[in-house]
Regions:
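Short, Lys/Arg-enriched N-terminal segment that forms or immediately precedes the first helix
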Residues: 4-20
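C-terminal flanking helix
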Residues: 64-71
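Basic, amphipathic "hinge/linker" alpha-helix immediately C-terminal to the N-terminal HTH DNA-binding motif
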Residues: 83-102
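Alpha-helical linker/hinge and terminal dimerization helices associated
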Residues: 100, 104-111
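Short beta-strand "wing" residues that participate in macromolecule-binding interfaces
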Residues: 71-73, 79
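N-terminal helix-turn-helix DNA-binding core of bacterial DNA-binding proteins
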Residues: 15-52
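Residues within the DNA-recognition helix of helix-turn-helix
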Residues: 59
Length: 111
């Protein structure tokens, strides 16, 4: 499959899974990074993606079990407190998130 076709398929899978008109490329960027490096703490994610902490937090909440404000919860990630440093959160994929990762990137994607 050509790279552009692969990317189109990944975007379609992602936007279908979120079923939300509020989906942005930033949501997919954050989700993709979590897929590559999970579990990851929120501070490391902020550094790796070179995004503001507030932006990362907003995106994480919309990808999580809870959602926030008008954004429907996607239930793709789980956010837990980092017991080593309570200022940070540990992010990992839920079962639904792992299923989407497999659809987007294939079964052999690193977990």
């Amino acid at each position: 499959m050509k790279q552009i076709e692969m990317l189109e398929m990944q975007i379609k899978e992602f936007t279908t899974a979120l079923d939300n008109s509020q989906t942005s490329i930033n949501h997919m960027t954050v989700f993709s990074e979590i897929c590559k490096t999970q579990p990851i703490n929120s501070a490391d994610l902020t550094i790796k993606l070179d995004m503001e902490k507030s932006t990362i937090n907003r995106l994480l909440h919309s990808l999580s079990e809870n959602g926030r404000g008008k954004v429907k919860a996607a239930k793709l990630i789980d956010i837990k407190m980092d017991m080593k440093d309570r200022r940070h959160r540990i992010i990992s994929l839920t079962t639904k998130g792992k299923s989407l990762m497999d659809k987007m990137f294939g079964e052999k994607h690193d977990r």
